Regions:
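Alpha-helix-loop-beta-strand connector modules within alpha/beta enzyme cores
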Residues: 47-55, 76-100, 135-141, 191-201, ...
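Structural preference for beta-strand elements that scaffold enzyme active sites
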Residues: 25-29, 56-62, 98-100, 117-118, ...
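N-terminal amphipathic alpha-helix/helix-capping segment at the start of soluble metabolic enzymes
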Residues: 1-28, 86, 277-291
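Active-site-adjacent loop and "lid" segments of alpha/beta metabolic enzymes
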Residues: 74-82, 95, 118-125, 181-188, ...
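N-terminal small/glycine-rich loop or linker at the start of catalytic domains
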Residues: 16-35, 64-74, 200-215
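Catalytic beta/alpha-barrel core
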Residues: 79-80, 94-108, 117-130, 141-152, ...
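Glycine-rich, proline-tolerant flexible connector loops at the mouths of alpha/beta enzymes
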Residues: 28-41, 59-81, 245-259
Length: 291
């Protein structure tokens, strides 16, 4: 079985490449939960680009064109595939930011891969072999969310499906484990365990504080714990931190309770970079488990 790459470099069409893994400085995957409009996407991308430049850190712009697993059938899902793809291309061309979005079916993979740099596999779909193989076949980098039901060591088989299909540019992303009803917990051991697979490891700090279905027809969340868990994950030595952010989370169409206000993102990112600098200095990011 082919092994995953320890380092992923996003270079295509970018003046400033973004490097994930291999002991390099952390990368942020950041943006609003769902794409609300072209204007909103461009405005948030512009602000994140300015933060990227000020902090000298790589940021991958993320947003979802379709929230396909909302709690309620009446909940807002996003602007849809056809409307979103040219906006992703415009964000990259205008702001020199690589982009990431979710795919939910094999049929979406080729079209989405023409517009974004990273395909993301949702946690609920992380064991769907046909979806993983279709995503792998695009040749794009793949970020796989670990299912809330999955042990960290089980991600080895998930990663092997993509790497074994000939695409070594794959990341494992922790987003919390189910702990009773409407609750997730983050087991920091899992980050070190997944690093032993050999691929870059991402920590999703915002979905880890989600309370799935906790508000009846939508999910709740505890955004005050995002910095707490993010600091812990960076101290463990993750390669990237995933943070959903919005200028007005309390009025966002989805995942508002666990999104970080955009005007607080830069301070949080700067703090996490300081933790990451220490992790690099101490060799934590490349240290084997038990060493």
């Amino acid at each position: 079985v082919n092994r995953p790459n320890a380092v992923i470099e996003l270079t295509e069409g970018l003046k400033k490449p973004v490097v994930i893994g291999g002991g390099h400085r952390i990368t942020f995957i950041a943006g609003p939960c769902q794409m609300q409009s072209r204007q909103h996407a461009l405005e948030t991308a512009h602000q994140l680009k300015e933060i990227s430049d000020r902090l000298n850190v790589g940021i991958i712009y993320k947003t979802s064109f379709d929230k396909a697993n909302r709690t309620s059938a009446t909940a807002a899902r996003g602007i849809g595939l056809e409307a979103a793809l040219p906006i992703f291309q415009e964000i990259k061309a205008t702001y020199d930011l690589p982009t990431l979005t979710d795919v939910h079916s094999e049929a979406q993979c080729v079209g989405v891969a023409e517009a974004v740099d990273v395909l993301q596999i949702p946690a609920f779909l992380c064991r769907q072999t046909d979806l993983l193989l279709a995503a792998a076949a695009t040749g794009k980098a793949i970020n796989i969310k670990k299912g809330q039901f999955l042990a960290p060591w089980d991600m080895k088989n998930v990663i092997a499906k993509v790497a074994g299909a000939g695409n070594p540019n794959v990341m494992a992303c922790e987003r919390g484990a189910s702990f009773g009803y409407n609750t997730l917990v983050s087991d920091m051991r899992g980050l070190a365990i997944m690093r032993e697979i050999g691929c870059p490891v991402v920590f999703d700090a915002t979905h880890s504080v989600q309370q799935p279905g906790g508000q009846g027809t939508s999910s709740g969340g505890q955004r005050e714990f995002v910095p707490v868990l993010a600091r812990a994950a960076v101290a463990v030595g993750v390669d990237a931190v995933f943070i959903e952010t919005h200028e007005d989370p309390d009025n966002a169409p989805s995942d508002g309770p666990n999104m970080v206000p955009l005007n607080q993102f830069e301070a949080l990112a700067a703090e996490l970079i300081a933790f990451d600098d220490l992790a690099i200095k101490l060799g934590v990011k490349t240290r084997q488990l038990g060493a």
